[in-house]
UniProtKB/Swiss-Prot annotation:
This is Beta-1,4-galactosyltransferase 4. Up-regulated by LALBA. Interacts with SLC35A2 (isoform 2; UGT1). Belongs to the glycosyltransferase 7 family. Gene3D superfamilies: Spore Coat Polysaccharide Biosynthesis Protein SpsA, Chain A. GO terms for molecular function: galactosyltransferase activity; metal ion binding; N-acetyllactosamine synthase activity; UDP-galactosyltransferase activity. One of its GO terms (cellular component) is membrane. The lineage of its organism: Eukaryota, Metazoa, Chordata, Craniata, Vertebrata. Highest expression is observed in placenta, pancreas, kidney and heart. Expressed in corneal epithelial cells. Its EC number is 2.4.1.-, 2.4.1.275, 2.4.1.90. It comes from Homo sapiens (Human).
Length: 344
């Protein structure tokens, strides 16, 4: 009886001891787990913060990239620029260099300029026929670039240079300028510009209108009066479509004179009117020069003028043959050099 009681107590004691040990082990393991978990909370917070920061940075980069690739749409420039000054006193420095003109026009690149603050209403190509008139070209570039920029134009200046050895053909050079310029840009408007004429008033807008426009109402050499009734030379403006419609200039005027009157007749044959600015606006200074060798008066000009109505469809842009020697994009202008075969 005593033995059984002792055994029974011993068994209960061992069972209790075993249970206590189990609870102790479980408690120890649980406490270690919670301590470890508590210690890991700051690390987890740091990880999540860094992850969130990376996510925000990633989104920011995406937004930045999208913003950089998205094209900003500018408003149209006003029909009358706020930068216009009106009549200007022109100064022609005898020691002017091309480097000076370039330094004065830092925003012109490869002969092109467009306003940054608005979208220009027209893309305008200025075509200047040229041979052996370097000083005149410098004076024109010095004054014409700021003049055009104040008018908020998207423009390019093309100087079409005739290679030596042939009689000068201004009209054919202008046909070449039109054809070659359109290979670079779908220009809206073309200004056919003599190298020795410099505009005095920037309200004389170098834009195209519903009808062809004659810009030289007067010049200093004629007392600022129109040279003669019907005069259509010096500086004229025709849209891409207008010039194409008249088949451009005739290619047959070798030497000086007649090609401007020929163009006027072509315009009139298409029942287009000619507009001009007000006399006080369409004023130009002609830089003095003597007649160039190779640009003598064309003795055939009157005979050619009598043929315009018969030949204008076949003589012009449609028949303009030439050898393209080079196209050079200088800082202030695009130089196009061509060679003609005399009589072609």
């Amino acid at each position: 009886m005593g033995f059984n009681l002792t055994f029974h107590l011993s068994y209960k004691f061992r069972l209790l001891l075993l249970l206590t040990l189990c609870l102790t082990v479980v408690g120890w393991a649980t406490s270690n787990y919670f301590v470890g978990a508590i210690q890991e909370i700051p690390k987890a917070k740091e990880f999540m913060a860094n992850f969130h920061k990376t996510l925000i940075l990633g989104k920011g980069k995406t937004l930045t990239n999208e913003a950089s690739t998205k094209k900003v749409e500018l408003d149209n420039c006003p029909s009358v620029s706020p930068y216009l000054r009106g009549q200007s006193k022109l100064i022609f420095k005898p020691d002017l260099t091309l480097e000076e003109v370039q330094a004065e026009n830092p925003k012109v690149s490869r002969g092109r300029y467009r306003p940054q603050e608005c979208k220009a209403l027209q893309r305008v190509a200025i075509l200047v026929p040229h041979r052996n008139r370097e000083k005149h070209l410098m004076y024109l570039l010095e004054h014409l670039h700021p003049f055009l920029q104040r008018q908020q134009l998207d423009y390019g200046i093309y100087v079409i240079h005739q290679a030596e050895g042939k009689k000068f053909n201004r009209a054919k050079l202008l046909n070449v300028g039109y054809l070659e310029a359109l290979k670079e840009e779908n220009w809206d408007c073309f200004i056919f510009h003599d190298v020795d004429l410099v505009p005095e008033n920037d309200f004389n807008l170098y834009k195209c209108e519903e009808h062809p426009k004659h810009l030289v109402v007067g010049r200093n050499s004629t007392g600022y009066r129109l040279r003669y009734s019907g005069y259509f030379g010096g500086v004229t403006a025709l849209s891409r479509e207008q010039f194409f419609k008249v088949n451009g200039f005739s290619n047959n005027y070798w030497g000086w004179g007649g090609e401007d009157d020929d163009l006027r007749l072509r315009v009139e044959l298409q029942r287009m009117k000619i507009s001009r600015p007000l006399p006080e606006v369409g004023k130009y200074t002609m830089v003095f020069h003597t007649r160039d060798k190779g640009n003598e008066v064309n003795a055939e000009r009157m005979k050619l003028l009598h043929q315009v109505s018969r030949v204008w469809r076949t003589d012009g842009l449609s028949s303009c043959s030439y050898k393209l020697v080079s196209v050079e994009h200088n800082p202030l202008y695009i130089n196009i050099t061509v060679d003609f075969w005399f009589g072609a």
